[in-house]
């Protein structure tokens, strides 16, 4: 990841309040808007509001619009989702997030927000049982999918966050497998009194929906994996260049699911892995690394990075670094008679230590 990210990981607890945001201790002057390597994975971001809600993409928080804060968090700040995975992948994944707007704004869904939430005295239109809940979760997928299809049919194209750069729809399928690499649906933040619980339709989660169909250079590409999130703009952070960003933990964790990583916790919040992976108990605002085992399983680390121990001896292991992995970052030991493997890595979560 870029220099700024490695520094903020070292000083994630050293912050000072600045107006309504937070400024990170950081000394980088690198302009991260200039990507040095060609993208090989595209994340399509679509802002969505419900039928009872007004436009929000240009609402400002700490002097920045929602669309700009989002792009800082995914693409351009000194620490962002794209750079996180470029570093975690050992330089193998180069992600770019692009946008689909409807006449410059968000897509609008056909139902109010409360329709997709649990019934209560304050929300009489909500679902009342698990059957209705499942049906409305399905309806939510088709709701935003159909809104995307309508926006594209109306002539809207994919662009950067402010519409000044256009992209061909073929950019959405970088590996040419006929599927959109990733879709991120970002719902409008809400002040409504609506209950959003674990596994409910409005929860932040990754799922599958194949209802978006796009013609790209004469072939059809289809949606598959997507994530949906609802961001709060109550607590924002700033890098050294005054880029305002969201806490990155949720966006990074959910993107991990798109890439194939599993949750390392359960619904009772039991998390044996705890802070050893961003897929378990992720830190905020900048999440820690995913584990050596996960990165190895993905093919991001090789036998040059994770060495197998075959004999007794003295082995040296340095702290996990955010500056790239050209050296050994872990060891593994096959435990005789157990069909299990013990992974060893050095993670320092103390102040000033790499995460």
Model-derived regions: residue spans:
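Positively charged n-region of N-terminal signal peptides that target proteins for export
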Residues: 1-7
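Sec-dependent signal peptide cleavage junction
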Residues: 17-34
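Fold-level signature of zinc-dependent metallopeptidase catalytic domains
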Residues: 31-69, 189
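Loop/turn elements at helix/coil->beta-strand transitions in domains of secreted/extracellular proteins
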Residues: 39-44, 93, 178-183, 274-275, ...
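Structured segments of extracytoplasmic/periplasmic soluble domains
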Residues: 51, 68-76, 87, 150-158, ...
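Active-site-surrounding "flap" and adjacent substrate/cofactor-binding loops of secreted or lumenal enzymes
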Residues: 54-102
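Active-site-proximal segments of metallohydrolase catalytic domains
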Residues: 83-219
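Extracellular hydrolytic enzyme modules, especially secreted metalloproteases
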Residues: 188-354
